[in-house]
Amino acid sequence: MDLGPSARASEYLSRVTTFMDDNVYPAEPTYAEQRRTLTEQGTPHHLPPVVEELKEVARSQGLWNLFLPESTDPAHGLTVADYAHIAEVTGRSIEIAPEAMNCSAPDTGNMEVLHMFGTDAQRAQWLEPLLDGRIRSSFAMTEPDVASSDATNIATRIERDGDDYVINGRKWWTTGALDPRCAILILMGKTDPGAETHRQQSMVLVPMDTPGVTVQRSLPVFGYHDQHGHGEITFDGARVPASNLIGEEGAGFAIAQARLGPGRIHHCMRMIGLAERALDMMIDRSRERVAFGKPLSDQGVVRESIALSRIEIDQARLLTMKAAALIDSVGTKAARTEIAAIKVVAPRVACDVIDRAIQVHGGAGVSDDTPLAAMYAGARSLRLADGPDEVHLRDIARQELRRR
C-alpha cells in the first residue's frame, strides 16, 4: 500500500508548505495580538483581520477548498489520502491555516453533507456561500441532558406541522455557533421516536436567525475560548420549512456516519501536524536551556521524550494514512475499524507529545507565553468530540470479536 502523496498532491503540498512558511507562521504573533484586542473589546469570536488577509492570499494562490474530493471537483479535487497530507501541514498552525484555506471544521463536513445529500435549492442557498467563504456554519448534535456518545439518545424533537418542521430541544458544544458569520446550523433530532432505533433521527437546516433559536452561552475548554466558539443553544418552537430537511426522514444517523468518515481523517492529520509542531518546540527549547551543567537536549530523560514523540507521531501518521487509503479504495463503511482506531490514537498521541513539550518548557509551558497550554486544551477536547475514545474502542472490539 503506497501511502505517499500522488504527483498532484505533492505539487499542492509544496505550495501549501510555502504558503505556511511565507504567510501563516509570520502572521501568528499578529493573530494572537488581534485576538487579545477583540476579546478586550467584548467580541472574542470575531475573526481577526489578519486571517481575512490570509484568505485572500490563499484564494489567489489556488489553495482554497482543497478538501473537496475528486468526485466533486475532478479537475482539482484530491483523494482523501492526498488531502490528508495537506491537513497535517495545516495542523501545525491549527487556529489559522484551516480557516485561511476554507478547510475548517465543521464547515468541511457540512459542505460534504450538502454536496452528498442536499437538494439543488439547499446547495444554492447554503453550499455556494460556504464554498466561497462568505458564511460559516455549525453542526448541532451533542446534547447536555443525555449521553450523546450514544447518538440514539438524542432527545431534540423535529416535528412536522403542515409545511414546516418545529424544533424543540437543547444542544451544546455546537462548534462555530458564536462566530457572527455563522448563518446556518445542520441539526440532528428525532422525527419518529417509534421507528427502528437508527431510523428515528433526521437532519434539518436551521438558519441562525430563526425565531426560537437562542445561543445561551459560549463554552470554554479549560478556560480557553475557541475563536469560533462552542455554543449551548436552545430551540423553543423554532420553525423551519419542510424543504429544509436533508435527505429523507429517518436518514439522520446514516448521514452522520457519512459525514464523520473523511472528517476524522482531517481531524487526526491536523492533530499529527500539531504534535509535530510541539515536538519542534520541545527540541528547540531543549537546545536553548541549560540545567546541571549541560543543555536539556543532552539529558537522557529529555532525549527519551524526544524519541518517544518521534516514534508515536510516525505510528499515528501511518495508521491514519492507512485509514485514508482504505476510504479511497473500499469506502468509509469498510474502513470503519481503521477510522475508529485513528480517532483514538491521534488525539492521544498529540496530547502526550504536547504534554512532554510542556514539561521541557517548565513553567513557561503552562503559561500563555507559549501556545502549548492552548494546544493541549484543543487536543484533549478531541478525545471527546466526534465520539469519545470509549465508543471507538467498543466498536473496534466488536469488529475484532466478529472476525474470530
Model-derived regions: residue spans:
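Alpha-helical interface subdomain recognition
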Residues: 1-95, 103-105, 117-122, 129-134, ...
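Glycine-rich phosphate/pyrophosphate-binding beta-alpha loops
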Residues: 147, 172-179, 224, 262-266, ...
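Long, acidic (Asp/Glu-rich), low-complexity accessory segments flanking structured domains
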Residues: 237-255
